Amino acid sequence: MPAYDNTSSVSGGDQTVCVTGAGGFIASWLVKLLLERGYTVRGTVRNPEDPKNGHLKELEGARERLTLHKVDLLDLQSIQSVVHGCHGVFHTASPVTDNPDEMLEPAVNGTKNVIIASAEAKVRRVVFTSSIGTVYMDPNTSRDVVVDESYWSDLEHCKNTKNWYCYGKTVAEQSAWDIAKENQVDLVVVNPVVVLGPLLQPTINASTIHILKYLNGAAKTYVNATQSYVHVKDVALAHLLVYETNSASGRYICCETALHRGEVVEILAKYFPEYPLPTKCSDEKNPRVKPYKFSNQKLKDLGLEFTPVKQCLYDTVRSLQEKGHLPIPPMQEDSA
């Protein structure tokens, strides 16, 4: 964890913050780190009594400084009651789907309500979890240039390719900036790439599924595509950094490195050779596609040191095993 300069930053102490969608993959880690730093946390969830949120109650400091609240983000009054009295808000809740009906209204109107409630509560800062999908989805974005926070996805291109997730996230982030400006809210945005690492929650998150499919034999080949990855703890830490650093502003791409899917399975095979990992690409005619080059300099300048991608992959598999989502081969059990 980077060293904090207390003259230019805030810290937990007597601060109360709200985390929306607290039971999610990134949000669970964020709640964990916030509690460790002494914050009092109000987490919004669909159902506080749902067993899938039970892991939050077991976090260190949760008994004393964590409360879970049933909130419908499409109901402004619902979120107002939780945000009132908070010093800051972390808006991480968002649907992950390619269904436009399920994506657009929750992503856009939910975000709008959170920012309006934050303005009324006069919170110090709102940190919004966006996505790399709001940055690079543009046919004119070259894989030969370094893509930084000034890039935006093209909405028409997202529509034409029916990438409703990127469309919804882009509309949501753009509207977040507009609403924040209208209401004079200090908004900072984190744009993570594909997030890997240990699961705190009992359920599998969307970003881990392709790793699981490589390991359990569901995927017989790998596609000719690249993916950029980052460790979940680094994403949570990025949220903390941009909240606590007074000078933080704008967008922050959160990315460690990019790998071709072939490189992913090669790394997995090195660490976990017992699994039936694919060895062939589904496209053997064309050369391997080049990855996008994303800049992570803004977060590095704040002091974030990224976890190497090999560690991300290793931690992900170990977590899938520990949570019972991936059987441990007998050979590995014997050597454990």
Swiss-Prot record:
Database matches in Gene3D superfamilies: NAD(P)-binding Rossmann-like Domain (3.40.50.720)
Cysteine disulfide links: C158-C166
PTM field: The formation of a reversible disulfide bond reduces activity by perturbing the positioning of nearby catalytic residues.
Pfam family, any one: Epimerase
Main location as per UniProt: cytoplasm
InterPro entries: Epimerase_deHydtase, NAD(P)-bd_dom_sf, NAD(P)_dehydrat-like
Active-site residues from the entry: K169
Tissue specificity comment: Mainly expressed in roots and stems, especially at the second internode and, to a lower extent, in leaves and flowers. Localized in vascular elements, with weaker expression in the interfascicular (xylem fiber) region.
Root EC class: oxidoreductase
CDD domains (UniProt xref): FR_SDR_e
An example Gene Ontology CC term for this record: cytoplasm
GO molecular function annotation: cinnamoyl-CoA reductase activity; oxidoreductase activity, acting on the CH-OH group of donors, NAD or NADP as acceptor
Family (UniProt): Belongs to the NAD(P)-dependent epimerase/dehydratase family. Dihydroflavonol-4-reductase subfamily.
Protein's name according to its UniProt entry: Cinnamoyl-CoA reductase 2
Lineage: Eukaryota, Viridiplantae, Streptophyta, Embryophyta, Tracheophyta
